[in-house]
Amino acid sequence: MNDDQWVAGISKKDAGRYSRQLLVDDFGVSGQKNLKNLNVLIVGAGGLGCPVATYLGAAGIGTIGIVDYDHISLDNLHRQVAYKEDQVGKSKAQALADNIKLQNSDLNVQVHNTSLDSSNAMQLFKNYEIVCDCTDNVATRYLINDVCVLLNIPLVSGSALRWDGQLSVYHYGSDCPCYRCLFPSPPDPNSVTNCNEGGVLGPIVGVIGSMQALEVMKIAAKVRTTLAGQLLLFDGREGKSRTIRLRKRDPKCEVCGDNPTITAPIDYVLFCGAGAHDKIENLKLLELSDRVNVTEYRNKRREQKPVLLDTRPSLEFEIAHLPEAINVTLKECRSLSAEDISNRLGLQNTEHSDVFVICHRGNDSQRAVLLLREKLVDIKFRDIIGGYEQWALKINDMFPLY
């Protein structure tokens, strides 16, 4: 026998690079080969997308596509750990692609620096075999789900908020439900909270994103114990997780059922009643006569100390507030009696007939005005347009933005 001959299951380079995962039961050489031939699309290059892309890139996925239209901002860095300070302002999709290529130069990374919508999703998805939903809004979740079903692509979906995270695999196997099977109708837009409003801890998205990457690797390696048909719930505060079994595919589902009525992407903004993005939309609930801008309020407070009601949760109030602000949260505006609110604001000991109402961005303050003027009919409540965000942008640039 010739000493220079051997049977190679994998190249010397790949054996050296991926040796530790080649030694894992149920993964091995076949799993690594499957990874190398796999095309995975990551939708969203934020807190979830960063660990998904980082771990899949390191694991040796053949092609990774990244879809995101947004740019890196300073308040991303605590949870979007693939980015650095000197990348603030740059394209997330491009920066994430560049960073994972630095870790593994063999990767083929496709950058889709665009907003995903009904007009381009089918074209974007058709060249990929697994999709990871790393987004943070309901409309895009329905869009991603429907397109994955229409193209018969497994969907690995994660979400995270505050201390908690969730993870599931949809449309993978004949009995596995899709997202629409479980949620045929979207939630009320006013009941939905994303991390821009509710906050999230960085390690939470790190855990969920890492597990999304793991599910992709399990699907690629054909490991039978995936989260298809199950929902993993992670409680970071308690350090606990549990898995619940989901109901099976709904034969009456509009997109994956026996007689589907959705055979192409629809208008998801119309369907959900909310935009397909995670930005906070500025509401217009009040007439202009019931509102003042931050410049007008600044002029008022220079004349005399006004009564200022701050509707933000106490955690946000602690970050920063104007000296005259009195913290009565939106929840308290709903629950407290007129007398209690009057006492909190000190209205019984003052001749003030005007009360100004402020919040983070000017949405909750409008909701509060609608509530308060029903309870205290003799008081003129006025919302401050744009809230503290506009105060920081136009009046005092040292006021903390968050």
UniProtKB/Swiss-Prot annotation:
It comes from the Eukaryota. Its EC number is 2.7.7.80, 2.8.1.11. It is an enzyme of class 2 (transferase). SUPFAM superfamilies: Activating enzymes of the ubiquitin-like proteins. Pathway: tRNA modification; 5-methoxycarbonylmethyl-2-thiouridine-tRNA biosynthesis; Cofactor biosynthesis; molybdopterin biosynthesis. Its cofactor is Zn(2+). The active site is at C195 (glycyl thioester intermediate), C359 (cysteine persulfide intermediate). The keyword Protease does not apply. GO terms for molecular function: ATP binding; metal ion binding; molybdopterin-synthase adenylyltransferase activity; molybdopterin-synthase sulfurtransferase activity; nucleotidyltransferase activity; thiosulfate-cyanide sulfurtransferase activity; URM1 activating enzyme activity. It catalyses: [molybdopterin-synthase sulfur-carrier protein]-C-terminal Gly-Gly + ATP + H(+) = [molybdopterin-synthase sulfur-carrier protein]-C-terminal Gly-Gly-AMP + diphosphate; [molybdopterin-synthase sulfur-carrier protein]-C-terminal Gly-Gly-AMP + S-sulfanyl-L-cysteinyl-[cysteine desulfurase] + AH2 = [molybdopterin-synthase sulfur-carrier protein]-C-terminal-Gly-aminoethanethioate + L-cysteinyl-[cysteine desulfurase] + A + AMP + 2 H(+). Zn(2+) binds at C178, C181, C253, C256. Its main location: cytoplasm. Keywords: ATP-binding, Cytoplasm, Metal-binding, Molybdenum cofactor biosynthesis, Multifunctional enzyme, Nucleotide-binding, Nucleotidyltransferase, Transferase, tRNA processing, Zinc. This is Adenylyltransferase and sulfurtransferase MOCS3.
